Structures are given as structure tokens and as C-alpha cells.
Amino acid sequence: MRVVHLITTLAIGGAEQMLVKLLRAMDRSEFEPTVVTLVNDGALIEVIRDMGIEVRSLDLRRGEVSTRALRRLITILRAARPDVVQSWMYHANVAASMARPWLPRRTGVAWNIRQSLYDISKERFLTQAVIRSGRLLAPHVDALVNNSRVSREQHARIGYVNMRSLVIPNGFEVDSFRPDPAARASFRSELGLDDDAVLVGVVARVHPSKDHANFLRAAELAAARDPRLVFLCAGRGTDSHGRCREALRGPLRGRLRLLGERVDVPRVMAGLDMLVSSSKTEGCPNAVGEGMACGLPVIGTDIGDTRDVIADAGRVVPCGDASALAAEIAALSALGHARRREIGDAARERIRMAYSIESVASRYGRLYHDIISERRGSGRLVSQLEPMPARPAEAAL
């Protein structure tokens, strides 16, 4: 079965890393993947190519809307002859549907929505427009995949309605993300930490939705309670972001490490004593599951399906409540290493049993087979969408 994955970019982020994990986990003797990006950038391009998977790009600039790129997408998809086009995130979802009328009727299209949506006005202007246009297109795709129950409910309320709307959560590589004493020792040595330090980390790119500011406010409050606490921010932009840099000169001076983007995330997490997710909007946070798989106590904000993932194996605090977050950080620190390890062991077991990448990949595989069976067996006609390219597709190709 040929599957084309269409995604905005392959910079390191939650959706992009989930795609990489899915590509690793799916049976290559059964599924033949190709990846197409809207924007030609990102550290994960070479990671995917090293897996022997072709990566192509429409070479769009960020924020650009281009009929030329749509014609190029149609050309690529026709040449690839996919059985299923799996798109990832709003922009790629809309692009897949815009190309759909020029593909064979047997080709299925599945959207993947990767975030919750609490307030559309907080999104960039172009993203707002793309989300709104998605309401018109969503009923006509073959499947609407959300990575959280909350996301599905929120998008349904604004008009994302589809007969096959389902939740497939993020999956986690428990063999890669695991407790690793050697990695813990080497990473903490790199940071110059002694054995008594309690290292609390956020692993997330800088974006308003990740709310690093709330984490830093909580860190300042918790640091005043416990002198052993040391804090860490890892992820794209954390080493240059103004609020993060400012914190280096404030109450967290000498107790905050800003690492920027890291490719050795399992090693970073192995060195932590607890992980925090301070996000304001998420679907099913990758960092939460990865931290739990590493055997860490995790504190997450009550957004998306974070509460469902953590369950009894961590702590959940109200979104944006720095005082509550600080209190939980201080409380976990006070428990001591042995008790934190017990909580972390329970967290890892929960991920292993309920959120392994193997089980998630199996669900995607079944979905693709269902789509193909329906398209080839029912004779269902593709919805008639308004032509988008500036000239007829055949002339463009």
C-alpha cells in the first residue's frame, strides 16, 4: 500500500516527531511511504531519508499561498500514485483536499489534527483562515483523525464534522525513551550538577501555546522554597527567547539552563528528576508521554488529553496557574528520589501498556485498509470541490 504523508515542515516538533515514529513503526513490507513537505526545512528531513524514505517538498516560504505549489503537489501525488494521502496539521490538511479532485477516485485522503483549539483568535491570522476553510472541507475527506478526545470535541463544535471522525493518540517509543542511569550521569555531568540537585525540565519549542513564561514564574516561586531545585528549558528557541534569557538574570540566576534545540531528547529526559508540561493548548502532548516513558514524574497542565494520559501516574494543575505548578514542583522535590522513582515507574508502565507506538501504528494501518476497502468497494464518489489552481490541472501538468 502506497501512503503519502503531507506535512507542513519537518522541523523538530510534536507532530513531526510523531510522523517519524509512525514511519519507523509501520511494516515496510506492507506500507510504502513517501513524505512531502510544504516548507523545505527541518532537522527531521535527513532522519527520514536515512530510513530510506523519499522526502520531497513544495518549497513554499512560510506564510506563502501559491497556486504554483498546488500544481506541484498535484504533480507529485499523481506520480506517487498513493492509495492514501495522510495529511498532518491544518495547512497540509487543506492542501491535501485542494489537490484531491485531480487524483484518481480510488485515492483516499485522511486528515490529522494535532492540537486542541481553545481560542481560535490566539492563532496567527493565516492559520485562523486555514482553520475556518477546513470546516468546509472536513466533511468530504475519508477520515478525520484527532490525537485527543478534547481536540475532536472542540473541532466538532466549530464545524469539523465527518462520518469517520476518530481519536488515535500519540504513541511512544518505550525502547528509546526509558530510564538510563549512564545517560543520566553523563548529562548531569555536562550541566555541572551534583547528586543533590533536583532537576526540573520543560522540553518544548518556544511558542505561545507552550507557555514557557508560566513555567518560569512557577520556577521562581518553587526555587524560593527549595534551594536544591535547578531548572532547564530544552527545545527550539529556548536559548534565544527574550523571556527565557531574562530569567537568567532574575531569581533563577545560576539555577536555570537554556539548552535550545536538542536531538538527544531521551538523554536530556534521562537526566531530569521531573518533567513539566506548562502548555496552554495541546492535543496529546508528546513530551508528557516521553517523560513518563523515561520513568519521570510528570506535572502537566489540564489541557487536551493530558489528564487522561497522566491518570494517577503524575500531577495535573490548572492551565496558567503558576502558584499551583510551583506547589507541585516543590511537593515532588520534597518526596525524595526513591518515592519519585516509584511514581516514575508507574508512569512508564502506563505508557507501555496504553500508548506504545506499535499499538498506535496498528490503528493507523487498520484505518488505511478501511479507507481503501470503502473507496474500492462502495463506488462512493469523491465530493465535487471547487477548482483551485489558476489554470486547468491537465494544462498545469
Which residues fall in each region the model found?
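A conserved mid-protein helix/loop that constitutes part of the nucleotide-sugar donor-binding site
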Residues: 13-24, 198, 202-221, 231, ...
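Short, structured helix-loop element that forms part of the nucleotide-activated donor/catalytic region
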Residues: 42-50, 225, 230-255
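Aromatic "clamp/platform" in nucleotide-sugar-dependent glycosyltransferases that forms part
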Residues: 261, 280
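Conserved acidic donor-binding segment of nucleotide-sugar-dependent glycosyltransferases
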Residues: 315-322, 331-337
